[in-house]
Amino acid sequence: MVDLVYSIMGDPEEIIPLSCSSGLDGTTAEDFGMAVFKYKNGVSFAKSTAVEIGGFERRQLVVVGTKGTVELCPFEWLSNGRNDDFSPQITEVREAFSGNWHQKGERHFSPEHGRYDGMFRAFADYVNGVKTNPYAYEYERKLHKILLKACGE
């Protein structure tokens, strides 16, 4: 999730880590991860926890700007009802581009797809020299530093 924020918004001016322990079943480790990323023109946040009942159904990416909003929710969903990493996924996209703040927007659904299919195809293309990896070493290094700050390091 942090890589999505970074790829969309760029380098944050400030990172505020807000991770904590839910205390569920006596857990003392930080199992609720959250960070706020402050920018000159806005704020982004990323949150993840395995203890939120029904949370998988609400996995989402929302991008809000002055010209509209795009929401992917659920971010990926098990279209066959199985709970495994390789079952087909679907994504719903809602777009609203209007001055009307109450507009519900247009809804689109992705075709079924494997959760990692695109990533593995792209990786194979990079390894075989078909495509150039768009993520340079410096990008990966900066992302790693941002991730560490988001974790409170």
What do these predicted regions represent?
Residues S22, R107-P111, G129-N133:
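Active-site rim elements
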Residues G10-E14, G42, G68, T132, ...:
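Generic structural signal for secondary-structure transition and capping sites
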Residues D25-A29, Y39-M119:
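NAD(P)-dinucleotide binding in Rossmann-like oxidoreductases
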Residues M1-R58, E138-R141:
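Rossmann-like dinucleotide-binding domain that binds NAD(P)(H)
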Residues G10-E13, F32, C73-W77, A122:
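A general secondary-structure boundary signal
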Residues K40, G118-E153:
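C-terminal helix-rich "cap/oligomerization" subdomain common to oxidoreductases
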